[in-house]
Amino acid sequence: MIHNRDQMSLSSKERLIFYKVSIMDNLSERIKSELLEKADPKYREFHSGLVPGTENIMGVRIPELRKIARSAAKEDWRNYLEKCCPDTYEEVMIRGMIIGYAKMDDEERMQYLNRFVPEIDNWAVCDSCMSTYKFMQKKPEIWYSYLRQKVEEGTEFSIRFGVVGLMDYFINEEYIDRLLKIFDKIQHEGYYVKMAVA
């Protein structure tokens, strides 16, 4: 830790970098601390059975993760998303939720989602984070195209991400025929794709 006297000898650019790193460390540490405080071993055991093969589950319930993510989305969330290397299932979930809760334009949100979607390795992160992406309803044509592209990427969880988003926000008279055509064309043997389209 740099003490105040040491900070005085830093240039303004160095002080800004130090300040941003301190904030990120504080936010990251606060999130880790809250997760430890809210972790429930019984829930961890139960939830581990729902997401087989997923490691590093702490056992924090989804409503608590949403509270943490909403709070983080009011702080220096950009720095957090850029620098954070999630160690736990819950930290990955929080990153995805922050993308939904933070205020940003569509282009920036797409950039963060493009980095986040490849990190998804289970249905729960995919579906829980998608439910925070209500912004997709505000500009449906942009987000319909984006989700269609995710389906076309062809990986198990990019397809699921696209399908779940289309089902959450685009099942209406305007889009239903298009969705059915997209779903009919999906040829993927992944279990979580099949369950999303079923």
Predicted regions and their residues:
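Intrinsically disordered, low-complexity segments enriched in serine/proline and basic residues
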Residues: D6-F18
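Short intrinsically disordered, low-complexity coil segments enriched in acidic
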Residues: M1-D6, A196
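Alpha-helical scaffold domains
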Residues: I23-A198
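N-terminal leader/targeting segments
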Residues: H3, L10, I23-N26
